[in-house]
A protein has these predicted regions:
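Contiguous hydrophobic segments
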Residues: 1, 53, 109-130
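Short, helix-capping/interhelical loops that line the mouth of catalytic, cofactor-
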Residues: 1-8, 56-110
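Alpha-helical bundle segments that constitute or directly flank the non-heme di-iron/ferroxidase center
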Residues: 2-29, 52, 56, 62-63
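Short amphipathic alpha-helical segments with heptad-repeat character
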Residues: 10-14, 47, 51, 102-105, ...
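N-proximal short alpha-helices
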Residues: 12, 16-20, 30-31, 77-88
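A general secondary-structure boundary signal
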Residues: 16-17, 21, 100-102, 111-112, ...
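Helix-loop segments that flank and shape redox-cofactor active sites
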Residues: 18-44, 63-71, 118-139
């Protein structure tokens, strides 16, 4: 595990986010929705993807704070597929690809702020880094 303290994790998140924001500042807004950055995905699509996964992490953290074990909500149509994660990501891409850039950017920034806020408020630092706390996460 890379991080062993909340302070180190938060510092890494903030540093990485600042570097990404600096890179994004150099991308003209006219290019943000252009496909082909990775496969058919645009920069906007990648940011929507990051925001979606951050939001899911925030939800899982909230549940954990309430004493509930983490549970990945997988649509029943995908749950039995060996490549369910790829299928899920493709489904989420399809659902978000036509969203306006300003909404995606708002979600991207908001999900970052909310994740940092939730981590700062997390009370049990030992539990945050205990790979055995939630067996379903396989040590992640």
């Amino acid at each position: 595990m890379k991080h062993t303290t909340k302070a180190a994790l938060l510092a890494d998140i903030e540093t990485t986010h600042a570097a990404l924001e600096a890179t994004l500042a150099r991308v003209p807004s006219s290019q943000m929705s252009a496909p082909g950055v990775t496969g058919e995905w645009s920069v906007k699509d990648i940011l929507a993807h990051i925001a979606m996964w951050r939001s899911r992490a925030i939800t899982q953290m909230f549940k954990a704070e309430q004493g509930q074990p983490p549970k990945m909500e997988i649509p029943a149509t995908l749950a039995k597929a060996a490549n369910w994660l790829d299928l899920f990501n493709a489904q989420e891409y399809a659902a978000q690809k036509d969203r306006p850039l300003d909404r995606v950017m708002a979600d991207f920034g908001g999900s970052h702020r909310q994740l940092v806020k939730r981590l700062r408020a997390w009370g049990d630092e030992a539990a945050l880094f205990d790979p055995k706390r939630y067996p379903a996460l396989n040590g992640r």
